[in-house]
Amino acid sequence: EIGVRLVGSEMCIRDRLYTMGKQEQTDICADVEKSLRKKFHKKIWCNFTKAINRYELVKEGDRIAVCISGGKDSFLMAKCFQELKRHNKFPFELKFIVMDPGYSPANRKVIEDNARMLNIPIQIFESDIFDSVYNVEKSPCYLCARMRRGHLYSYAKELGCNKIALGHHYDDVIETILMGMLYGAQMQTMMPKLHSTNFEGMELIRPLYMVREDDIKAWRDYNELHFIQCACKFTDTCTTCNNEETKSKRQEIKQLIATLKKTNPFVEGNIFKSVENVNIDTLIEYKQGGVRHSFLDTYDEKSGKTE
């Protein structure tokens, strides 16, 4: 089913491009950009710029590699960055990069066609990540993600960039928080920006940090856009991604949050804010800078103090 959907999307995009002239393609791009300024101004654009400003993701003189995977999130991020550059008060540069980890010809063409239709000047570079992780039995998705990031950092640095931008959104953040607690026995979050530990001077930023996934889907559907989903070899022959044997832990967390939301409409916001309201004085242990600390370290010093 997934393979069929991807091919269907490719055919849809190809047919649209073949049956329209350059002016019509320009009009589609203009409509997509207008939707960010009008219909989705509050839910997408304002939350995009809110994250940019709140977490200081973009600074004067930055050269940012906007990483496009081919999905809805990264293409939306690219359009938001183009809009930001048009209106921002200080100069910064953008490079739109696509890593081909071994896409099928159909999936690669979907990405190229979408980039052309949306007027995004992508630069594609090759890697063999899919082949490298195909025979890995334990955590191939985790290994693939780590290898992808390394290749993206490396290529971005070759282009003179000091930052890479990834398309993780608000829902990714709250799901990561719960996954860490329920499956990893740890309290942590997906950070809005990080310094690279392996590529000196490089940073990773997540500009869609405060944008909801449902709003991204609404933007996609409103503009009748078609993007690839997961295009790796592991899902090429998958007939369903919702059965009990194949669904991911992240999908389980999505369903858990949806269930909790039925009785508590604020549950998503509460999860998001929980990592902003951590009281270290109430933790048994915590790690900082790789060093583990215990409440016992300072317990006797607090003797006689008010609780």
Residue ranges and their predicted role:
Residues R146-L159, K193-F199, K254-S274:
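Short, basic, helix/turn surface patches
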Residues I2, F90-F92, V267:
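Residue-level signal for beta-strand positions within conserved beta-sheet cores that form or flank
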Residues E93-L94, D172-L256:
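Catalytic subdomain that performs nucleotidyl-dependent activation
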Residues H41, W45, R108, R149, ...:
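A structural signal for well-ordered alpha-helical scaffolds and beta->alpha junctions
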Residues C12, C141-C144, C161, C232, ...:
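Disulfide-bonded cysteines in secreted/extracellular proteins and peptides
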